[in-house]
Amino acid sequence: MGALSHLRVLDLSRVLAGPWSGQILADLGADVIKVERPGSGDDTRAWGPPFLKDAQGENTSEAAYYLSANRNKRSVTIDFTQPEGQRLVRELAAKSDVVIENFKVGGLAAYGLDYPSLKAVNPKLVYCSITGFGQTGPYAKRAGYDFMIQGLGGLMSLTGRPDGEEGAGPVKVGVALTDILTGLYSTVAILAALAHRDQAGVGQHIDMALLDVQVACLANQAMNYLTTGNPPRRLGNAHPNIVPYQDFPTADGDFILTVGNDGQFRKFAEVAGQPQWADDPRFATNKLRVANRAELIPLIRQATVFKTTAEWVSQLEAAGVPCGPINDLAQMFQDPQVLARGLAVSMPHALAGAVPQVASPIRLSETPVEYRRAPPLLGEHTEAVLGDVLGLGADAVERLRSSGVL
């Protein structure tokens, strides 16, 4: 039994941030019911190619994007623009612990599915609203996608090559990181609200905004600005506060060197055949190395090209200096540590026979994550959920289906 197997979550969200939170809760054992539009479902079902292939090598209807954020859930199709559909969602909410939604501010009020409406039928409900900009403020009514929030929220000003270098300019992160982090923060907030409910007996509304999360996750870079008034500049792969902490060329590619303290720098200098660097008045401490970055980095680049990536990694690891290769995803999934940790799993799938999944990183000793159910087909569990949760019989379900509610 999962740690959250006593909970039911009604997931009205689409795309990534909300579904990511729902998947985490589902991985931990919660019964997560994904409510989708009849006929089309979650937008990401069509966000391909690539699509999952069947045994004959033909594309199925399941896009890889959708498959990344929806395992261990049950899918029901309900058209809640119709009164009958609204009634069904309200009845499901009355029997749920959590609702997750990511509609525009006020969007669900028109259907009687906003927090005040559902609180009236279930005062213990934890209701998590995820939007681009939050429920308040001048941007509250605006839609917000990860890419635009990375730009507006300052992250892209920190990523990319520095001005003056070839290819200079702001660059977005290679995955929808703001969405994913919002999903993580939403999960933390939901669990906190559930803990409060267990003590106080009442639920609450959670107002999560992609912009808020993005700003919060600027972390040390935000503090670099707030303590100085100077906006941090793009440094490519370099670190604003630690040197050397970036990529360097090797005889056959590149590697990452992450020197975290002066002792590690001394060890690196010895492996590099330049022990004098550790006592050089320009480089002896991290503060000096940051101040003299422009002098030190070219010297390191001149030294690193004489060994292969594997040689650097082997020798520096032996010396206790953190470093590593730069892997593509094929190399990453074949890395012995990734294999040992079981970070790729396979689950039975109705259309393809099996579907690959990235494993949850959560490792609990007493209530481990269980891979119970592949990302569901559209409406795969409609009849079962309406029967199990609401007690509707086959005739009632068929009537709702024939009237276009399901």
Tell what function each PLM region has:
Residues 284, 348, 352-399:
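Flexible, small-/acidic-enriched active-site or ligand-binding loops
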Residues 241-319, 323:
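Aromatic-enriched alpha-helical interface/lid elements that frame and gate functional surfaces
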Residues 318-372:
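A glycine-rich dinucleotide-binding beta-alpha-beta segment and adjacent secondary-structure elements
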Residues 135, 165-176, 198-214, 233-240, ...:
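Conserved Rossmann-fold dehydrogenase catalytic segment
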Residues 183-203, 216-227, 269-276:
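Oxidoreductase and adenylate-handling cofactor-binding alpha/beta cores
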Residues 39, 133-134, 210-215, 252, ...:
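Glycine-rich beta-alpha junction loops
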Residues 1-189, 193-199, 377, 383-406:
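N-terminal helix-loop segment corresponding to the beta1-alpha1 unit
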Residues 32-35, 317-331, 392-397:
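Short, well-structured beta-strand/strand-turn elements
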